[in-house]
Amino acid sequence: MLPTILLYIVIFLYGIVIGSFLNVLIHRIPKKENIVTTRSHCMNCGYQLRWYDLVPLFSYLALGGRCRKCKAHISVQYPVIEALNGVLYLLVFWKYGMSVDSLVYCLLFSALLALSVIDFRTYEIPVGFNLFILALGLIHGAFHYTQWLDFLIGFLCVSVFLLILYYATGGRAIGGGDVKLMAVCGLLLGWELIIFAFLLGCIIGSVIHLIRMKVSGEGHVLAMGPYLSAGVAIAVLWGNEFLQWYLNFYL
């Protein structure tokens, strides 16, 4: 029991460390800043953060959510992204155990988390994230090569439909980044799970979009990336169980 608890603690710590790097990507990629050489600093006073200011999650709590020098508030995004990434890693390892699949899905979830925040703010999905997920799909497919046809169909079945929709509406109904996202995630998940993920993402997005319009009383541009990503994450964790329940219920 104790070794298992220690393992999950290590996994969570690893998750929040990667989550800290995701915050760097979320902040710098839209601004086209260098993600390697640029020093982390306070957005208010420019104070260059020391290593002890950058300990994921714990530094934020120790500083009370404020800059060490100017005492300006630090965005709550930083601890939320770190903690959420850690929790997602725990869920993946709880579901898939110590396996290549767990490693691939953890990296997938991190990419989805970062691109979701960027897309929500900028309405663009940086192409690098889709290329990264494509690489994960190829690696995953190499370990599950007997299912290559499922993955190939998954790559095409949703993305081709969305591509037609994209050109038919001049990009007003769906973004090009969303088309690519569904293609590369389909390569990773296979056709059954990507269809489930797409439909679920559309439902989640529609409901939240309607709530936002109802509350604000005005229209909003819908960034689909976060909702499609949520659909993919749910499909990875519970999609097969849902599909099995659905088939048993109706057949």
Mark where each language-model region is.
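Long, highly hydrophobic alpha-helical transmembrane signal-anchor segments
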Residues: M1-I29
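Residue-level signature of transmembrane alpha-helical entry/exit and packing/kink sites
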Residues: T4-F12, Y78, E82, D101, ...
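Alpha-helical transmembrane segments of multipass membrane proteins
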Residues: I18-N23, N85, Y89, H140, ...
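Membrane-proximal soluble regions of multi-pass membrane proteins
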Residues: S20-Q77
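Core segments of transmembrane alpha-helices
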Residues: I81-L88, F129-G137, V179-L181, M224-S229
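Transmembrane helix-loop-helix
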Residues: V92-V104
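Functional transmembrane core segments of multi-pass inner-membrane proteins
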Residues: S102-L103, L107-S206, L210, W245-L251
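Interfacial loop-to-transmembrane junctions
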Residues: I211-I234
